[in-house]
Regions:
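Conserved, well-structured ligand/cofactor-binding cores
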Residues: 1-235
Length: 235
């Protein structure tokens, strides 16, 4: 501990590394989410003059355009994107130099400042030292808040997928308002049947993320005294 690990503890180095790794994944996810939103907006423009029936409680209500449906899909995801961007900024506050419980024992202020500067230079991100290192070492609410935002995004994404499945139902005895791309043969016994496999796969991925959020919540709930030892399962 006199050389490579000087001024460090698992309780500051590990949380710092995981938060920055999550932030890196966040940036990649946002770029993919932007592509999805752009695709939905493109379809909204394409279908702006296509009339369909609007429905409440699955019953016919009033006419609308198919473009309005796709614009609403895009807007709901855009809203959640903004929440994710806002909540992700907490990952840029690190506790390097906090050492064991946040008091900074066996560390120095100069070390903390040097760490933050080195991380900024390496990543080009606006990384800062947490205001309260004891709180930052014991509390994992940044992960909880971000996971909640992911859960909400996936809940809305499930709604989009469910609507696409309903609108593509049929073709003879369902709504048959849209045609989803044929990704694979749908049945070995019913020739020509095509299943909405992409929305179904996305739904299942979302269910996993929503389940992970429960795990993150329980992990955050298990924080005791000066350290949350459940961060590995939360990450």
């Amino acid at each position: 501990n006199d050389h490579v690990n000087a001024s460090q503890s698992t309780n500051d180095a590990y949380p710092c590394a995981t938060r920055l790794a999550i932030y890196a994944d966040h940036l990649e996810m946002i770029s993919h989410l932007d592509l999805l939103i752009s695709s939905l907006e493109r379809k909204a423009r394409e279908f702006k003059d296509v009339i369909k029936m609007g429905r409440t409680q699955l019953q016919d209500a009033v006419p609308m355009t198919l473009g309005l449906s796709f614009h609403a899909f895009a807007q709901s995801l855009r809203n959640e994107k903004e929440h994710l961007i806002h909540d992700s900024k907490e990952f840029l506050y690190v506790n390097m130099g906090a050492t064991a419980i946040g008091t900074g024992i066996c560390s120095t202020l100069e070390y903390r400042e040097a760490c933050v500067k080195a991380l900024r230079d390496l990543t080009k991100w606006d990384i800062n030292l947490s205001e309260d290192l004891v709180e930052a070492t014991s509390d994992a609410s940044s992960m909880l808040v971000y996971s909640n935002a992911l859960r909400t995004l996936c809940t809305n994404l499930c709604k989009v997928c469910n609507d696409l499945r309903l609108m593509s139902s049929g073709p003879r005895c369902g709504l048959n308002e849209i045609n989803l791309p044929k990704m694979q043969p749908g049945s070995s016994i019913m020739p020509g049947k095509v299943n909405p496999v992409i929305p179904e796969v996305v739904n299942q991925i979302c269910y996993r993320v929503i389940g992970n959020d429960t795990c993150v919540m329980l992990g955050a709930n298990y924080a005791q005294l000066e350290l949350n030892v459940m961060e590995p399962v939360m990450v």
